[in-house]
Amino acid sequence: MNNKFLFLVFLSFFNFFTYANSQEQVNSASTDLENESSLPIFEEDKANFVNNDSTQPVSIFNISDLLKIVLFLLIAFFIFFLLKKLIFYSKKSKYEQNSNLIKELVFYEIDVKNSIRIINILDNVYIFLVSSNSFTLLKEIKSEEELEDLKLRLSKINDSAKKDSFQSIFKKMLLKKEEIPSSGNDYVKLEEKIEASLKDKQDRLKKF
């Protein structure tokens, strides 16, 4: 659509310049005829003609030439603006297409250096444990049923008041239904176990 519009604009301006040139040729031809008709025949007329020509000012630019230059600059600026706009929108659409390939569904910050991220990469969902110096895959969602179940759990988390709850994240996303602990003490133990694992990993990284 944009290419057709540019072509029509270019064609209209081309026709305009063709018409302007033809009009200028007609005007110049009529001017030449008038000049030829006013040429002197006798010697006295020649002397008067030379004196009249010497008193007329000589203009470097014609008004029509000046108008052509202004129109050309306006058209060049207009076409440049359209091309810049088309390039901008093409880059923007390409960026949006690439950004749709990778989407972060959930980001949960455990502490300053560690976080849990659920990322959709080419319609495959992965759950990562991200620390300052490592990137660990916790779980991969392979089947469509697991993906739909994950979407349902994510919607429940978004509607839940415990959106930032550590226990809620692991209860509704990382654990299977049969693996969900039944008491609050089990949740505390699970949290302590994960925090201890993270601390151990950090200690090993520091030694390394």
From Swiss-Prot:
Pfam family, one: FliO
Keyword Repeat: no
Domain of life: Bacteria
Regions annotated as coiled coil: none
Residues annotated as transmembrane: none
Keywords annotated in UniProt: Bacterial flagellum biogenesis
InterPro entries, alphabetized: Flagellar_biosynth_FliO
GO biological process annotation, one example: bacterial-type flagellum organization
UniProt GO cellular component terms: membrane
Purpose of the protein: Required for flagella formation.
Name of the molecule in the record: Flagellar protein FliZ
Species, as recorded: Borreliella burgdorferi (strain ATCC 35210 / DSM 4680 / CIP 102532 / B31)
